[in-house]
């Protein structure tokens, strides 16, 4: 199989595509099962070898009720890890995933890019680290529910691109009224102590509500940083980064009405 797509159908389980599963000598370039109704893998699943596996828009994982019995939660299925599937790019957009069990990525040894955008994640497990994600260079966590900056992602030693766009959650007031809020507000300190600080080149935190980025905690080693649509942000850019912006070596995504200090060459209202 070079390319295989069965998207936009009504499948409820992921089948065995290869007779020898993950041990097959053949690797598919692309396998797409997106937009089905897949909740589980076939009993006796043997694994898969694919450069790109797309499972987007499937209600994956074991469903269970919370203590209140009102909400159905889903965990990422562990069959891919248990079968030591060989996947370079795994796409799990909009799969209703709430949590990642510790064993989720344990044996995905060649994984290089992971897209978990559009789920309901609030944290990354401590096992999400250099031992299980040693070669991951691209990570998309956009459109989830992180209220605390997922520093666990910065333990990945080869991380090059990280997307954290639009973290939101539903909150309920004392009267039972529900509303959606941007829940990621605090910028972390100590980023420079993490392995990914030296390798990360693109960081996108747009469409959040980050409050303040001090000069000493500014990510100086990235070459593309997007802070647009953070309406309450106050940020100070180091002088060396401003020089890079001026020479075209650093791309900053921002809004003209944001409070950004330290770089008069930017087209900001406060610089006019």
Residue ranges, per PLM feature:
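Conserved hydrophobic position(s) of the canonical leucine-rich repeat
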Residues: 1, 11, 28, 38, ...
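Conserved hydrophobic beta-strand positions in leucine-rich repeat
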Residues: 2-6, 29-33, 51-55, 88-92, ...
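Consensus "Asn ladder" position of solenoid repeat domains
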Residues: 6-9, 36, 58, 95, ...
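Canonical leucine-rich repeat
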Residues: 14, 41, 63-64, 75-76, ...
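Acidic/polar low-complexity surface segments
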Residues: 17, 21, 57-78, 165-187
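Leucine-rich solenoid repeat scaffolds
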Residues: 223-272
């Amino acid at each position: 199989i070079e390319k295989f797509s069965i998207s936009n159908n009504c499948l409820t389980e992921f089948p065995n595509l290869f007779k020898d599963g993950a041990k097959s000598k053949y690797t598919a370039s692309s396998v797409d099962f997106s937009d089905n109704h897949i909740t589980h893998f076939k009993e006796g699943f043997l694994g898969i070898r694919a450069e790109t596996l797309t499972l987007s828009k499937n209600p994956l994982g074991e469903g269970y009720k919370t203590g209140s019995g009102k909400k159905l939660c889903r965990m990422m299925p562990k069959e891919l890890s248990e079968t030591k599937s060989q996947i370079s790019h795994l796409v799990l957009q909009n799969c209703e995933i709430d949590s990642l069990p510790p064993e989720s990525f344990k044996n995905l040894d060649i994984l290089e890019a992971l897209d978990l955008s559009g789920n309901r994640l609030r944290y990354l497990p401590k096992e999400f680290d250099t031992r299980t994600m040693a070669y991951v260079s691209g990570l998309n966590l956009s459109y989830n529910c992180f209220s605390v900056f997922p520093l666990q992602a910065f333990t990945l030693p080869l991380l090059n691109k990280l997307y954290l766009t639009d973290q939101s959650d539903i909150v309920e007031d004392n009267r039972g009224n529900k509303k959606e809020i941007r829940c990621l507000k605090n910028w972390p300190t100590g980023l420079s102590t993490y392995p990914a600080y030296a390798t990360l080149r693109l960081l996108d935190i747009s469409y959040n509500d980050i409050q303040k980025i001090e000069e000493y905690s500014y990510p100086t080693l990235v070459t593309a940083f997007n802070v647009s649509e953070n309406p309450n942000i106050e940020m100070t850019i180091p002088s060396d980064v401003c020089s890079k912006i001026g020479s075209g070596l650093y791309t900053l995504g921002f809004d003209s009405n944001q409070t950004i200090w330290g770089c008069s060459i930017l087209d900001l209202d406060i610089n006019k």
